[in-house]
């Protein structure tokens, strides 16, 4: 009897723990750049736009909103600056979303006053603090963790001191003679666009590199 009671109690405990874990997903126009002070990567994200949390503590994400918008008769890619969003976790799954942007006017309005919504799957809105993440240094997107650490130490609107790293190493080394080195990644070029292409090519997996090279061939 004691064994049976212990088994039932253990099962109940495991069930409650499992139900306590929630998944955070983003709308189709949102990309997660960082989660709780760490740069988002494949090991952190279940998919491109989702990750798990298992508590109701304070959490912080950095997101970018991307949309194809109309500019007259043309269509162009709008990408927002990184936006820091701080919110409390929930035992429910959470959805973080941005409004759909279809034209230049809507994109400009969003840029001037970005609004990211945080809700549980049942529809309850979760209070959040939001702020732009200032981008500094060469290749600011690559320096994301360093910039975010500095932001979290600043006491700004959406900062969380607990996610700041006191001595965050620079992600990209000092530029010397047009070269930037980070481990085995080396880029060299006459302008930032060329250096960015080289950097992201070396960061990509082999399949992505092959798709990119095939695409380049079609552009000639």
Swiss-Prot record:
<feature type="signal peptide">
    <location>
        <begin position="1"/>
        <end position="21"/>
    </location>
</feature>
<dbReference type="Pfam" id="PF09829">
    <property type="entry name" value="DUF2057"/>
</dbReference>
<keyword id="KW-0732">Signal</keyword>
<dbReference type="InterPro" id="IPR018635">
    <property type="entry name" value="UPF0319"/>
</dbReference>
<comment type="similarity">
    <text>Belongs to the UPF0319 family.</text>
</comment>
<protein>
    <recommendedName>
        <fullName>UPF0319 protein Asuc_1002</fullName>
    </recommendedName>
</protein>
């Amino acid at each position: 009897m004691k064994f049976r009671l212990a088994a039932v109690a253990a099962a109940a405990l495991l069930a409650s723990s499992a139900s306590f874990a929630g998944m955070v997903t983003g709308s189709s126009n949102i990309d997660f750049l960082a989660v709780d002070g760490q740069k988002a990567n494949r090991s952190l994200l279940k998919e491109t736009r989702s990750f798990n949390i298992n508590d109701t503590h304070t959490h912080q994400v950095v997101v970018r909103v991307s949309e194809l918008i109309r500019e007259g008769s043309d269509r162009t890619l709008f990408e927002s600056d990184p936006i820091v969003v701080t919110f409390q976790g929930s035992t429910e799954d959470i959805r973080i979303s941005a409004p759909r942007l279809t034209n230049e006017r809507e994109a400009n309005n969003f840029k001037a006053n970005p609004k990211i919504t945080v809700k549980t799957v049942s529809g309850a809105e979760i209070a959040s603090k939001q702020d732009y993440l200032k981008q500094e240094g060469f290749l600011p997107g690559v320096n994301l963790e360093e910039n975010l650490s500095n932001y979290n130490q600043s006491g700004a609107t959406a900062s969380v001191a607990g996610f700041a790293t006191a001595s965050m190493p620079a992600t990209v080394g000092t530029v010397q003679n047009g070269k930037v080195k980070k481990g085995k990644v080396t880029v060299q070029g006459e302008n930032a666009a060329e250096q960015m292409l080289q950097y992201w090519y070396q960061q990509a997996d082999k399949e992505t590199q092959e798709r990119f090279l095939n695409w380049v061939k079609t552009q000639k």
